[in-house]
Amino acid sequence: MAGNSIGQLFKVTTFGESHGIALGCIVDGVPPNMALSEADIQPDLDRRKPGTSRYTTPRREDDEVQILSGVFEGKTTGTSIGLIIKNADQRSKDYGDIADKFRPGHADYTYQQKYGIRDYRGGGRSSARETAMRVAAGAIAKKYLREQFGIEVRGYLSQIGNVKINPETVADISKIDWQQVASNPFFCPDPVAVEGFDELIRELKKDGDSIGAKLTVVAENVPVGLGEPVFDRLDADLAHALMSINAVKAVEIGDGFDVVEQRGSEHRDEMTPQGFVSNHAGGILGGISSGQPIIAHIALKPTSSIMVPGRSVNLNNEQVELITKGRHDPCVGIRAVPIAEAMTAIILLDHLLRFKAQCR
């Protein structure tokens, strides 16, 4: 199985399954002499881990990360950093009924057809549990970006179902209330929308159903020049990284799909001696960072693991009806915010190292 690594100079390789013994990753390319300990990584993992609020899956995992290599006397050595997280609350028996059945909307069918075998327990490698290691690696990238370049990578939830935040709360990137984002389980900058999210999720849990979501990632203080045209454009690599997150079905950079209705006179980001007048492009022009905040949005589908009966087939292509047991998120977008931040940080650090190697 290929496709387990991302990045060139800053490279992250993950391994492990949802109900396996452990999850792990190897992080290559971290510059030497950066202070690093588990305490630098754990806060982001705590933001992603399950069982932290009534709005997410009740599966309980401490997600305590252990650094296995690449750090000596509290500092990175420049060698590969090995990270591991032990699984503790698998409850694989919940999945016995689907051992020979394909959950509709999941990767069960495609994994079985491609490999001729699959780990049906919680989705195995296709489970979003794999993203814990992305968050761990991303925490390292975020620390280096922040300490060495002053780059901040942060995200927020902007929509669940038909409940949206007030656009005015995020109209000025520099005035987003990040303390408000950190203070609620929805990572939401709009306290009014938080109430709407709460009501919607309660209703969904009662119905045994799920819903989709939209979130935004913002990277501030990114220097001009990141990106390698033409095939390794910064926006192309960023879209690739964000699309690799489980359940993501669409990525927008800047104004995204709204550009369809804009005229050129409106969309172009005009310039003055003081700088850009607008940021419709989302901080990337011609595949290269412009120095403005990088803004990306992602849309996540509703999870297919629900209590509402659905039609599918088994390994013998016979019709079956499924109710997915187990513990699942009514909205996977809620815990996706730190994952999207991590993937953005990984791409930015990779491109920063490539920029320094080639241009300065």
Curated annotation (Swiss-Prot):
Q: One GO biological process from the UniProt record?
A: amino acid biosynthetic process
This protein's cofactor list reads:
FMNH2
* Source species, domain of life: Bacteria
Task: Indicate which residues the UniProt annotation says bind FMN.
Answer: 125-127, 246-247, 286, 301-305, 327
Q: What is its EC number?
A: 4.2.3.5
Record-annotated residues binding NADP(+)?
48, 54
What the entry lists under CDD domains is as follows:
Chorismate_synthase
Q: Give the EC class as a word.
A: lyase
One GO molecular-function annotation for this sequence? chorismate synthase activity
- Record family assignment: Belongs to the chorismate synthase family.
Cite the PANTHER family for this sequence. Answer: CHORISMATE SYNTHASE (PTHR21085:SF0)
Q: Could you tell me which HAMAP family the record lists for this protein?
A: Chorismate_synth (MF_00300)
Q: What is this protein called?
A: Chorismate synthase
Native species of this protein? Answer: Actinobacillus pleuropneumoniae serotype 3 (strain JL03)
